Each structure stands twice: as C-alpha cells, then as structure tokens.
C-alpha cells in the first residue's frame, strides 16, 4: 500500500508515476475526498473546542448558582455532532483505504519506462545455448518416453494443467529442490522455513494478492470459520512472518527460504502454454524472502538476484537477466529483475525467477516495522522476494538442455549426490 499521506497531498505526482505502469489514478476522487476530509476535520476540531469551552462554562455557572440547562443541551448537541463527524471521517478514510488497496506500487527511478514486456531491458547473459547435432525433443516427449511424465493420468485425476511425475524424473525434481534449499541455506545465509500451505485473507492482503487478484487464487470456504486460500507462492507465508511486529534493527536483515507447492488458477492464461509443465495449477518453488533496513534494500535486491542466478550457474544452464519495465512489473514491486533460462525446444529464453524489491509497500499493509536505532521510533521495513527457483521450470530446462540423441538425460554434476551417483536417466 502506498503512503496515504503521499497520495492525499501529492495526487498529481503520484498519478504521473503510476501512469508509467499503465495505471490511471482517480485523482479527481482523491482530491474530492481530501477536501471533504479537511472540511469535516476542521468542523470537528472547532466543535471539540466549543464543547470544551461549554464544559468549562458549566462548572463556572454551577459555582455562581446559574441555570446550566442550556449549556448542558449545547454540550449534548455538540457531542452528537462530533459523533457524526467521526462517522463521516471514518467513511472517508474507509473509501480512501479501499482505493489504496487497488493501487500498485510506485516504480523506482532506475526502472526502465515502457508499456509491456517489449520494453524490458536485458542486463546480462550467462552461458551459451548448446548447439545440438540431432533433432531436439521437448520435455514432454522426453518425459513421456518411459512414462515418467504422465499428463494423461494427471488430467484424469485433476483436470488440465497438472502433471504426474514418476521414477527418475520425480527423483530429479526432488533433487533440484533439495539442491536449491541446501545452496541457499549453506552458502547464501537463508534460514529454512516450513510454512502452512493454507492462509487466511489478511496474509494475502498483506503481500498484495488480495483484494485485486482473488480470481487467481484457490479458495476454500468453511462454514462458520474464516475462508482459507492455497498459497500462490511461499512469499505470502514467509513475508507475513513479520506481520504486526516491531523488530530490533539488529535482527535485520532476515532471510527466509522455503520449498513449497504453489497453487494458481491461471485465470488469465487461457490458451497459453497448454503443453507440458511451463504453466500449471500446482507447481513447486523454492522461494527466498528478505526483510531489510530501507537504506539497504536496493543493494539487497542485487544480492537476492545473484542468489537465484547462482542456482542456474551451478546447473550450467544458460540464462539472461532482464530489468522489467514499469508496465511489466508485478503489482507490489518497485523494481524487478526476471531470470530467463534457455529452453531449446522453444529456441528462446523463458522466465524461471522473478526477484523484486517491494520497498515499504507490503510492510505498510502488514504493519511490519523495525525500531530505528537513531530515533528510537518504529519505521516500516522493506521486503524483497524472489524465486530460487521454480522447480518445475528448472526441471524442464535440465531435461531439455541435458538431453542426448537417444532421448536419455545426463544428470548435472551438482545433482549427482542427490541422485545416488546416477549419471544418466532414460
């Protein structure tokens, strides 16, 4: 959530920055609400001053033995008007809060301006895509060859956009997740967490998925109890660990990592990536979250991105890093880098990680703060998140980049310890 004071006092400036994201701020309505708020607040303050004066006059009139009934009537009337003023202020604030929940974050000044993914800027590349001397198969053909990837049975069980993995491919999928978690905890300083896969609405509001993106979520209604939602990413549960807290500055940065399934309805993805494991309703992901001092958050974003890149480097998978433009960033991000891995069957790079600095946007929603050691006052932390990595898409990249002419798959060196020393599957 944006700073309400900033939106109220500088709506034109905020609108101009949001316009670079393709978001149209209703400036007229915000200015009208601000005028109403000022008017009601001024009147309320005047009434309170008058009521205080009347109350003081009642005591003085009593001492003089005068009739205080008119003064009491004034005090009662003003009390009713003050209650009405409070109701009006609450209604104005409620409408503003509702508007704020639907407004995306402001892009950082370093973010390239553009309308869509075509304006994203390539920052760097690592590795060279392999040249094959045989016809490249996609991961579906490679996995179905021995029945180790079974989309037909998955569809029978659950419908479209699900996968059933068996045998060596299931083991390879598990090996990837274990490798990622071990790397991030042992070398990158993250604390591993096991989180709930079901969360309540306030957690999703805290990280920005609600109320705007409810159609993307799987919701579980419960009679007489709060609804639960399947997490679309462990970002939700990890970031909300600090919800409502005031942290000691010495605790920062906090760095969490978790391997979880993720659940998404893919409501806006009809017709896209219908074949294979690229876009599914259920997929595993290793998620990294950092809670940091605001002064260090953009430096932390570079480090977070490097942590995700390290996974791809050790797997020797070619990739590139993109700085997302204003029009392609996620709702809560102020700056984002996407990592795209080379997928030979598609002859292009595909997203495998998104690393974002959300500034104080999520922290304000969650009321996650730290105590500034210089002022002693609570201030909002900054939050960051990134995939380290999406396990299913990493599996796709390994299957396709490590395929051999006979359809077998070489096991990447860093995964061999997790595969019992197996060097080739298939």
Curated annotation (Swiss-Prot):
Q: List the keywords (alphabetical).
A: Aminoacyl-tRNA synthetase, ATP-binding, Cytoplasm, Ligase, Nucleotide-binding, Protein biosynthesis
Q: Keyword Transmembrane helix on this protein? A: no
Membrane-crossing ranges are none
Pathway involvement of the protein, from the record: Aminoacyl-tRNA biosynthesis; selenocysteinyl-tRNA(Sec) biosynthesis; L-seryl-tRNA(Sec) from L-serine and tRNA(Sec): step 1/1
Keyword RNA-binding among UniProt keywords: no
GO MF terms held by the record: ATP binding; serine-tRNA ligase activity
Q: Where in the cell is it found?
A: Cytoplasm
Q: Which GO terms describe its cellular component?
A: cytoplasm
Per the UniProt entry, what is one GO biological process? Answer: selenocysteine biosynthetic process
Catalyzed reactions: tRNA(Ser) + L-serine + ATP = L-seryl-tRNA(Ser) + AMP + diphosphate + H(+); tRNA(Sec) + L-serine + ATP = L-seryl-tRNA(Sec) + AMP + diphosphate + H(+)
Quaternary data: Homodimer. The tRNA molecule binds across the dimer.
Per the record, the similarity remark reads:
Belongs to the class-II aminoacyl-tRNA synthetase family. Type-1 seryl-tRNA synthetase subfamily.
Q: Which HAMAP family does the UniProt record give?
A: Ser_tRNA_synth_type1
Q: What is known of its domains?
A: Consists of two distinct domains, a catalytic core and a N-terminal extension that is involved in tRNA binding.
Q: What is this protein called?
A: Serine--tRNA ligase
Which organism's genome codes for this protein? Pseudomonas paraeruginosa (strain DSM 24068 / PA7) (Pseudomonas aeruginosa (strain PA7))
Query: What is this organism's lineage?
Result: Bacteria, Pseudomonadati, Pseudomonadota, Gammaproteobacteria, Pseudomonadales
Name of the gene encoding the protein in the UniProt record: serS
